[in-house]
């Protein structure tokens, strides 16, 4: 015998009542969580915000202000207008350090990213020991720049001594020494980013390209690299900014020798501020110029690579 129709009606009402009760219970729980978040948000946000303002915003604003002053301490600052900026741009060593740094940033960008991408491709293939190799390649990134600089200085000078020369005697030996050092340190980090990008590519896309007759080289240029643009954007941005901001390795490996010809911008600013009495304001002006250059280059690079992402 078929069940009466009103049985289905009552069963439906019971199910609806059950679901409604759970819905309103869940809604009350969500509302209570939102109220708790709003109530305790200042407790978690304000200390972090205060630390950010005290540790970054306030010193940055103070530094910009001091770039227009002549001073030895903050209390005796005397406003001199754009005089410090004029001296900074007239400093031939500072101008040389800019071009030297720009060349280094471009060269390190190419070397680091080509090697990191090649390693990522190799280590995403099905082979034994990939996790061990990933760890080995990443480990140099954990060592401090100062320590690496002194270690590689001993290595390079030990080799160059056989040819009666040293890093401190030739700016281009120092330049390529820095390229090798920084590449050895950062390739592993960029490799991890590229591996994450490669693993995010859907396997169906690669299979479809292979079925369509694309060889490995065509799949690399037409499929892999276009779909890797987000990872490439991150790595190129990090490589360029790290290249311009390089300080520790430059200080410990070459210290700007010979005659400040291998001195990069960050080291030049440091030597101006702490090494030349009465030039503290000029050093601060150089720091502001340096900040503007790094931000501008970073924004241009991001815009260029982001446009590539959109096109792909």
Regions found by a protein language model. Give the residues of each.
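A structural signal for multi-pass alpha-helical bundles of membrane permease subunits
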Residues: 34-312
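Short, Lys/Arg-rich, polar N-terminal cytosolic tail immediately upstream
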Residues: 18-36
């Amino acid at each position: 015998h078929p069940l009466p129709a009103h049985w289905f009606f009552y069963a439906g009402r019971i199910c609806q009542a059950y679901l409604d009760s759970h819905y309103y219970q869940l809604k009350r729980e969500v509302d209570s969580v939102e109220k708790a978040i709003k109530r305790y948000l200042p407790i978690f946000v304000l200390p972090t915000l205060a630390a950010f303002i005290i540790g970054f915003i306030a010193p940055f604003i103070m530094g910009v202000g001091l770039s227009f002053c002549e001073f030895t301490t903050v209390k005796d600052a005397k406003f001199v207008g754009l005089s410090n900026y004029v001296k900074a741009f007239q400093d031939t060593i500072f101008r040389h350090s800019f071009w030297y740094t720009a060349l280094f940033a471009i060269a390190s960008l190419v070397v680091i990213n080509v090697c990191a991408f090649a390693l990522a491709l190799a280590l995403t293939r099905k082979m034994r020991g990939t996790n061990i190799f990933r760890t080995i390649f990443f480990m140099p990134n954990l060592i401090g720049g100062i320590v690496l600089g002194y270690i590689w200085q001993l290595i390079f000078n030990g080799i160059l001594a056989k040819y009666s020369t040293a890093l401190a005697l030739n700016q281009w030996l120092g330049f390529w020494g820095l390229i090798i050092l920084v590449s050895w340190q950062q390739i592993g980090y960029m490799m991890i980013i590229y591996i994450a990008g490669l693993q995010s590519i859907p396997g169906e896309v690669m299979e479809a390209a292979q079925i369509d007759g694309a060889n490995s080289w065509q799949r690399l240029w037409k499929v892999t690299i276009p779909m890797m643009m987000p990872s490439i954007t991150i790595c190129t941005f990090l490589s360029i900014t790290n290249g311009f901001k390089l300080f520790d390795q430059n200080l410990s490996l070459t210290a700007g020798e010979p005659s400040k010809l291998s001195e990069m911008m960050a080291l030049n600013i440091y030597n101006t501020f702490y090494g030349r009495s009465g030039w503290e304001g000029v050093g601060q002006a150089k720091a502001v110029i340096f900040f503007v250059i790094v931000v501008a280059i970073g924004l241009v690079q991001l815009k260029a690579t982001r446009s590539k992402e959109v096109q792909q």
